[in-house]
Structures are given as C-alpha cells and as structure tokens.
C-alpha cells in the first residue's frame, strides 16, 4: 500500500458510513468533534433555509448530538 494512503485512510469515509437524507438527495456526514450548536445551525440554515420541510430533518440530529 501507498504510505500516504495508510496515513490518510483514518479520515476517509465510504458512502455507507455517512448519514444520508435520500428524499432530498443531499448527504451529510456527522464526523466532526462536538462544537457548539451555533457552528452547525448557521450553515445548515443558510444552505437549506428555503426548504422548510427538510430543515427539521437536518437540525434535529445536530441538536441531539450536542446533548
């Protein structure tokens, strides 16, 4: 194996390791360390704010992750 691959494979995620919301076609990967909810709510709201019916599906896992 390539030495660089061995080094970086710790941070490589396959498609089945991500959380996928298939009804909207968007995929989200929750692999970051715990930060404040404000760091996640703001980007999600700015990216998907016009899709109000899916906004709850995106924000609930983020908020529950903080508990």
From Swiss-Prot:
Q: Name one GO cellular component term.
A: membrane
Task: Indicate the transmembrane segments per the record.
Answer: 12-34
**Principal localization?**
membrane
Superkingdom is Eukaryota
Q: Which UniProt keywords apply?
A: Membrane, Transmembrane, Transmembrane helix
Any Pfam family the entry gives: SBF_like
Keyword Transmembrane helix assigned? yes
Q: Where in the cell is it found?
A: Membrane
Q: How does it sit in the membrane?
A: Single-pass membrane protein
Q: What's the protein name?
A: Uncharacterized protein YDR182W-A
Q: Which organism is it from?
A: Saccharomyces cerevisiae (strain ATCC 204508 / S288c)
